[in-house]
Amino acid sequence: MPKIFFLPHKLLLPKGGCFECKEGETILNVALKNNIKLEHACEKSCACSTCHCIIRKGFLSLSGWSEKEEDVLDKAWGLESTSRLSCQAIIGNIDIEVQIPLYNTNYIIEN
C-alpha cells in the first residue's frame, strides 16, 4: 500500500504527516480523509486551482494530467514543474511526497 508524505505546512499541518493510501485515490481525498483541510473551492471539478500542490517525490508515478488540468494549473500561485491539482492527481503504487503551498489563489484574492 503506497504512502503519502505531506511536508509541514504552517497552517494546515505544522508537523507534516504520513498516511497510507490506496492506489487510485486522489491526493485531495487522502488529505480530506486524514483531516487536512486542503481547500477545494470548485468541489473537485477541476475548475479552480485552490487544491494546487507540489509533488516533491514520486511525480512520475501519478496519473497523467489532462489539458483542462494544465489550463487550470496555469492560474495557480507558486506554480512549479511538478505542480498538480490534488483533486485530479491519482496515486499510483509508489510512495509520494507532497508540499502544500503556503498560499493559494483564493487566499491571495480574498486577503
Swiss-Prot record:
Keywords: 2Fe-2S, Electron transport, Iron, Iron-sulfur, Metal-binding, Transport. The keyword Iron-sulfur applies. GO terms for molecular function: 2 iron, 2 sulfur cluster binding; electron transfer activity; metal ion binding. Its cofactor is [2Fe-2S] cluster. One of its GO terms (biological process) is P450-containing electron transport chain. GO terms for cellular component: cytosol. [2Fe-2S] cluster binds at residues 42, 48, 51, 87. Binds 1 [2Fe-2S] cluster. InterPro entries: 2Fe-2S_ferredoxin-like_sf (IPR036010), 2Fe-2S_ferredoxin-type (IPR001041), Adrenodoxin-like (IPR001055), Adrenodoxin_Fe-S_BS (IPR018298), Beta-grasp_dom_sf (IPR012675), Fdx_isc (IPR011536). Residues 1-104 form the 2Fe-2S ferredoxin-type domain. Belongs to the adrenodoxin/putidaredoxin family. Ferredoxin are iron-sulfur proteins that transfer electrons in a wide variety of metabolic reactions. NCBIfam families: fdx_isc. This is 2Fe-2S ferredoxin.
